[in-house]
Design a protein with these regions (language model features):
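Non-catalytic interaction/Regulatory regions outside core domains
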Residues: 1-131
Length: 131
């Protein structure tokens, strides 16, 4: 998995940041766009350091591509998104086809995570039709 500064176009990048900021406000910490082979951090809140082991996080979240396939015929319905809860924050991951986004936040409710998920998914789909 490689860090690719040109993986996402500037228009889609701006749309993702806007959609996520609208959904979760100032609790937004970071946004990372990824595919099965590469990733790009498109937003990092100014009070945070860029020294996190992003590659390891992306490798873990990219496992979601396999999860999406594994749950394809679940009696629970289609896989929607993943919300991870940590001591100091939250990770919400959305996968749509061969690309995904995960956002980190200071705090988030289940309702707010659903809202950010819907915002990300609609932005990705709108970006796909604009490509």
């Amino acid at each position: 998995m490689s860090d690719n500064r040109d993986l996402i176009g500037p228009s889609l990048e701006e749309q993702l940041v806007s959609a996520c900021r609208t959904a979760v406000g100032d609790s937004l910490r970071s946004i990372t766009y990824f595919t099965p082979d590469a990733y790009e951090q498109v937003y990092l809140r100014s009070d945070l350091e860029a020294d996190a082991d992003l590659a390891a996080s992306v490798e873990h979240e990219a496992a979601g591509f396999r999860t999406q396939v594994a749950y394809a015929d679940s009696e629970l319905g289609n896989y929607q998104y993943t919300l991870r809860v940590f001591e100091n924050g939250f990770v919400t991951r959305v996968i749509d086809g061969e690309r995904g986004v995960f956002v980190t936040t200071d705090g988030i409710t289940v309702l707010r995570s659903k809202e950010v998920t819907e915002a990300i998914r609609s932005t990705l789909r709108a970006g796909a039709t604009a490509d």
